[in-house]
Regions:
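Bacterial N-terminal signal peptides
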Residues: 20-30
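Conserved, charged catalytic cores of large soluble enzymes
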Residues: 238, 248-253, 335
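Aromatic- and acidic-residue-enriched carbohydrate-binding clefts of CAZyme catalytic domains
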Residues: 145-181
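Cap/lid and interdomain-hinge subdomains that line or gate substrate/regulatory clefts
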Residues: 165-171, 186-194, 227, 249-276
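N-terminal secretory signal peptides that target proteins for export/translocation
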Residues: 1-18
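Long, charge-dense tracts
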Residues: 233-234
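C-terminal functional module detector
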Residues: 34-90, 94, 101-145, 149-151, ...
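Extracytoplasmic ligand/sensor domains, especially the bilobed periplasmic-binding protein
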Residues: 213
């Protein structure tokens, strides 16, 4: 049986030699047996935890409240973050997330203007915490020449740190990590200790009703440099989480193997897990490809598994937006947001991007393909909601444009960071100005607890923003009337479904309708407009349309139904803007004028703010920078994307 397991591990791309796979199985079996022996103690500990939580007074909101957080955050535990100069620990990150002031990697003090409601620290599973031991000169690790060289580079300056921040992900992508990092005999004991420290820190800062510290990690699959990463988020506490070690891409780069691990975790512990893919925009066309990583066409079994384990998709983060692309959505004048520098290749630039790849990298096209799969074999692999996140590797939970803290410690606030070359390969360069100060995950839940927030994510009652706190409600139904806007929550939940929901089988004579309410970030820009993005299949053809459904001012639709620009108040000389245009709130009850009850469709809402400065403009003003690249965005329209509501005729 052990032989079959190891052969299977090899077959599915674990990249681990046979003797290591055997050792890995033995060690994991040993851990499992140890945990079984502690079942009674763990059960008592869990009971104590439940009793303790029950004594805490948690405010509940029956009609749900929006909670703001980050579902993608790295600290010094991640190898590429540590190699790039990050020394912020999970404890540092939690302290900043709850509003404390902390000196960061560059010695500058950071304090959030508004604390987070929740944080998922998602350090890379691959060598979890092991790179700290490389820095410490761990005797066993120093027997490897690559580890010794990295140890010396870690003692260098900024140039070495920038090189390591690129070299470590590349080593993972091309199976060139130091042997002790991939050898379970050396790696697992270090990872297990680091993981238990990580879960203990999460328990320390998790305060039900006040702040939620999720236990999470990132599975970092990057075959030949194509980004297929997933963030795995547990609903559970340390008692359950400590029964595992995070599943990594060193065991398998196949997401189906990750899902199998998640299923085994739930069966073993009674816990719950979900995964959030990200950066389809740099996946080399693999994120939503028509073939699995093993080369098989998608089928119903695959679709049902993916839909079960991956209810959300990260549409926005530091490495750009993955909603759509101008070459795919040619009639969408706002499709060019967050693409600068990211549509030229995959994560590592080992493979340059082609138009064919783009068809399988973005959320909107995945939604359309999902309708096609559902029609073909009765299941939709891409029935996911949308969220935003940061993917910061500094350990600093930053989101505001004028407080952008960089991707890595090497580009924390400093004059030259916008024009620095952060990656160069195959004749293509990526510059610092390609990074975006993003994003947020907003979740609707009855309370700020792990269980409530996780359940909100699972049911897709969540949305993403580019880093602004736009408050957005979306309900779909067939029985709404204008008066319902005055009681949108009661009417929305009572007569329809919220974002992430399903509507089926419209009654003859009734049109699908959506109640939408958007409120500006109180600390930022007014709202320009609300749009509904619709996709459907008609006579075998994939169709999409963007409708302007509510907007500020007295603008009128043109002959094509388009609304003119809202204007621009940004002063490029000092980085200021005013809210003399736009509106603080927009509401609408919108009926789809093209609704056909016989055609399946999806609808999601996009809310645009008025133009505002980017972090690049703030840097330009702050540091007196005279020259930036022509394609460096100085002004942008920040936005929010709701999770879709799906309509099915059956």
């Amino acid at each position: 049986m052990l032989i079959r397991f190891c052969n299977r591990l090899q077959k599915h791309g674990a990249g681990i030699p046979f003797r290591y796979a055997t050792t890995l199985f033995a060690l994991l079996l040993s851990i499992s047996c140890q945990e079984t022996a502690k079942t009674r103690d763990d059960a008592m500990e869990a009971a104590d935890s439940v009793a303790e939580t029950a004594e805490i007074e948690v405010t509940r909101y029956p009609l749900k409240k929006v909670f703001w957080g980050d579902t993608h955050h790295h600290t010094a535990i991640s190898g590429d973050a540590f190699g790039g100069g990050t020394r912020m620990t999970p404890e540092d990150s939690y302290r900043m997330a709850i509003g404390e002031a902390v000196k960061t990697n560059s010695g500058q003090e950071f304090k959030m203007r508004r604390p987070l409601d929740f944080l998922c620290i998602t350090d890379h599973a691959e060598g979890f915490g092991v790179f700290i031991e490389i820095d410490r000169g761990n005797e066993i690790l120093m027997q490897d020449s690559i580890a010794r060289r990295w140890n010396q580079m870690l003692k260098g300056g900024k140039e070495e740190a920038m090189q390591l921040a690129v070299e470590i992900p590349s080593a993972l992508a091309n199976n060139r990590l130091p042997e002790p990092v991939t050898n379970p005999e050396t790696a697992i004991p270090l990872m297990q200790a680091s993981w238990k420290d990580h879960t203990a820190t999460a328990e320390k800062y998790n305060k039900p009703g006040e702040f939620t510290a999720f236990i999470a990690w990132e599975w970092t699959s990057v075959p030949t440099g194509n980004n297929l990463h997933r963030n795995v988020i547990l609903r559970d506490d340390k008692t359950r989480a400590d029964q595992i070690i995070p599943f990594s891409a060193l065991q398998s780069e196949d997401a189906e193997k990750l899902w199998e691990f998640m299923e085994s975790y739930e069966a073993k512990t009674g816990g719950k897990a979900l995964a959030i893919p990200h950066n389809g925009n740099i996946s080399g066309g693999l994120m939503f490809a028509p073939l699995t990583i093993s080369g098989e066409p998608l089928n119903r079994e695959y679709a049902e598994a993916r839909s079960r384990w991956e209810p959300l998709f990260e549409v926005m983060q530091i490495k750009g937006a993955s909603e759509t692309h101008p070459s795919l959505s040619t009639e969408d004048e706002f499709a060019d947001f967050g693409i600068q520098g990211w549509d030229n290749g995959n994560l590592t630039l080992d493979i340059l991007q082609t138009p064919e790849q783009r068809k399988y990298q973005y959320a909107r096209q995945a939604y359309l393909n999902g309708l096609e799969y559902e029609e073909r074999f009765g299941a939709n692999p891409y029935k996911f909601g949308l969220v935003g996140a940061s993917d910061t590797h500094t350990g600093v939970p930053h989101h505001d444009e004028d407080m952008f803290w960089g991707k890595h410690a090497t580009n924390e606030p400093m004059p030259e960071r916008a024009m620095e070359v952060v990656k160069k390969l195959n004749g293509v360069s990526r510059y610092g100005y390609g990074y975006t100060s993003a994003g947020y995950t907003a979740v609707y839940a009855e309370a700020n607890t792990r269980a409530d927030l996780w359940d909100g994510m699972k049911r897709k009652e969540a949305y993403g923003t580019s880093g602004t706190r736009i408050e957005l409600r979306v309900f779909g139904g067939f029985d709404f009337v204008t008066e319902d806007l005055g009681t949108i929550l009661e009417s929305g939940y009572g007569k329809g479904v919220p974002m992430g929901g399903d509507l089926k089988d419209a009654v003859a004579g009734k049109r699908i309708a959506f109640m939408i309410h958007a409120k500006k970030d109180p600390n930022w820009a007014n709202l320009d407009r609300i749009q509904v993005v619709k996709g459907w299949l008609e006579n075998g053809k994939k169709m999409e349309k963007v409708y302007d459904v509510a907007w500020s001012g007295d603008r009128k639709p043109d002959a094509k139904g388009k609304i003119a620009s809202v204007g621009n108040t940004v002063d490029l000389t000092d980085g200021s803007f005013t809210n003399t245009i736009g509106e603080p709130e927009l509401s609408v009850l919108w009926y789809d004028p093209d609704f056909d009850p016989e055609l399946a469709a999806f609808y999601y809402v996009r809310v645009l703010e008025i133009p505002s400065p980017t972090w690049i403009l703030y840097d330009k003003v702050k540091y007196g920078i005279s020259d930036v690249a022509d394609d460096a965005p100085l002004v942008q329209q920040e936005r929010a994307w709701s999770s879709p509501i799906w309509y099915s005729p059956r």
